[in-house]
């Protein structure tokens, strides 16, 4: 970025929590750079800082590992932790870029570079703060490391094409942020415009009026999951129906797994325990979908004795074995890599998982009637 974003010093423990910096990196597009705490931190809080680093690793789509060239000794020994992390990322199918820093302080840095390349079977790129000429090669290598399918999945999949008429039903109630639209709505509108679709956006109370104003029925209606029932009852028969949350189930997660998870709702009881996981951090308001609406729908069916826990942000239990079902939000605030890491944890512990929109579609009896699209999951 060319900016002083993090405090940098030779003192261990300078970086405590991961530092996030968003920027535009051409030709990739918008990226977030995460500067983590050192994994060699042996201070009293070191283990907790390393846990934060591991959490950041779950979100990482490309890992950059720094090796200090002025370290003395056999690379296999002095870089043991760095090599462990490189192996960890490879196991997670995450590309790794190795940088050898402080080359101006080590006369034998070329030998070190060759040895690390032998150990990792990866190219190592030398960098030096006093000579930024090597950064161009690093940027080129970074771009080459980006997965070929990065950014290729689209939100609406194969549901629309050039010239299609699409209606978006977006309640602007007490939960809607002041003066702006929520991220899934913004991203969906932008994608539809890029795909040359004709887009009409309405609030729930103007849904029927909006249909009347159209010269033809929309090919696709995308609604907020909370008003699935109302929109289904009033939509034209020929119009496909889905929701932002269902689309994001495929865009950010594993839609087939979510659908199978939703079917396990029918096997819950009043003694079941459910985890509702919200990615964004906000103060819950009246009729919050995760805190009130979905719990109310579940307890209406199975009784008030059902135990429902909530987590938000990056809080997500390592041990999920005590839950009968996990209900994840759409995941718009996190990247797909991180949502899939949550899904992988649930799968490994044999805990069913679904998301908000798929849950509501199942509970309202229209899960087998809505449109999903293909090509994302």
Set out the residue ranges of the language-model regions.
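Flexible beta-alpha connector loops of hexameric P-loop NTPases
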Residues: 6-8, 37-47
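Conserved C-terminal guanine-recognition region of P-loop GTPase G domains, centered on the G4
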Residues: 21-29, 34, 48-124, 181-197, ...
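G-domain G4 guanine-recognition motif of GTPases
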Residues: 36, 66-72, 94-111, 125-133, ...
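Canonical P-loop GTPase G-domain recognition
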Residues: 91-97, 102-158, 165-167, 196-198, ...
């Amino acid at each position: 970025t060319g900016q002083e974003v993090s405090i940098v010093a030779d003192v261990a423990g300078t970086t405590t929590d991961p530092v996030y910096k968003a920027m535009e990196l051409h030709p990739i597009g918008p990226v977030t750079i995460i500067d983590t705490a050192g994994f060699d931190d042996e201070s009293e809080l070191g283990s907790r800082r390393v846990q934060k680093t591991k959490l950041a690793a779950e979100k990482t789509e490309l890992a950059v590992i720094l090796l200090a060239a002025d370290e003395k000794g056999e690379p296999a020994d002095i870089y043991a932790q760095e090599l462990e992390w490189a192996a960890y990322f490879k196991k997670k199918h995450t590309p790794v870029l190795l940088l050898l820093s402080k080359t101006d302080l080590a006369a034998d840095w070329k030998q070190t570079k060759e040895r690390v390349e032998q150990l990792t079977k990866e190219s190592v790129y030398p960098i030096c703060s006093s000579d930024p000429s090597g950064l161009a090669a690093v940027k080129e290598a970074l771009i080459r490391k980006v997965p070929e399918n990065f950014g290729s999945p689209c939100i609406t999949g194969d549901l629309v094409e050039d010239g299609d008429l699409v209606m978006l039903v977006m309640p602007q109630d007490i939960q809607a942020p002041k003066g702006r639209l929520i991220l899934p709505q913004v991203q969906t509108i932008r994608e539809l415009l890029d795909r040359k679709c004709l887009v009409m956006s309405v609030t729930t109370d103007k849904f029927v009026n909006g249909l009347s104003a159209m010269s033809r029925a929309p090919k696709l209606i995308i609604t907020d999951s909370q008003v699935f029932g109302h929109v289904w009852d009033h939509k034209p028969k020929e119009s496909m129906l889905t929701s932002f949350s269902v689309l994001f189930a495929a865009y950010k997660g594993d839609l087939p797994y979510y659908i199978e998870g939703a079917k396990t709702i029918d096997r819950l009881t009043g003694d079941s325990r459910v985890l509702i996981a919200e990615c964004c951090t906000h103060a819950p308001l009246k009729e919050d979908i995760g805190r009130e609406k979905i719990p109310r729908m579940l307890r209406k069916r199975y009784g008030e004795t059902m135990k429902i826990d909530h987590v938000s942000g990056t809080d997500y239990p390592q041990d999920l074995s005590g839950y009968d079902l996990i209900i994840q939000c759409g995941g718009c605030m996190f990247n797909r890599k991180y949502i899939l890491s949550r899904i992988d944890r649930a799968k490994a512990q044999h805990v069913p998982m679904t998301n908000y929109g798929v849950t509501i579609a199942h509970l309202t009896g229209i899960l087998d009637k809505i449109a999903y699209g293909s090509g994302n999951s």
